[in-house]
Amino acid sequence: LCPEGVEELRALREAVEYPAAGRIYSSPMLRCRQTAGVLYPGSEVYPIEQLKEYDFGEFEGKTAAQLEGYPAFSDWTSGKISAPPGGEDTKEFIKRLCVGLNRAVCDMMENDITEAAIMMHGGAIMMLLSATAVPRRKTVDWTSENGRGYSIRITPSLYHSSGIVEVYGTV
């Protein structure tokens, strides 16, 4: 995170009441771990590999404007292909995120943790919630600003039988 980003998160931490968390899980990527450190100072961060952001392959680091003339980009955004060249298949991405969430849930149950926070990338949050959350929403309807997110409730019997989580608030 750049110094301005750290300050922005510190100001947000002072202005917003973040949920209590007995454990902090995170994407292993540096900016998520740093965000966790700012929002939950002094807490140990438990990285979960499967919570990493999407692998955009050849599209990585490029803006949509830079990719406009690239035929594979329009094929990918229109759904003609399921992955950017050299990138991750969208269905595999969702499966991976669900495995990551399940790792966190199982760890919580094994360690008698009832409240936790998960630091993830915006696109990963959107994809995971569009696949698992009620109320049901389109992927684009699960956006959140940096340092913000959603509060979810996991009912063990419902989660283990269907993979469903309930979103009940925003942070």
Which residues are covered by each model-predicted region?
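Active-site-proximal alpha-helix that buttresses catalytic centers in soluble enzyme cores
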Residues: 1-43, 90-91
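Phosphate-handling substructures
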Residues: 39-98
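Acidic, His/Gly-rich catalytic cores of divalent-metal-dependent hydrolytic chemistry
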Residues: 163-171
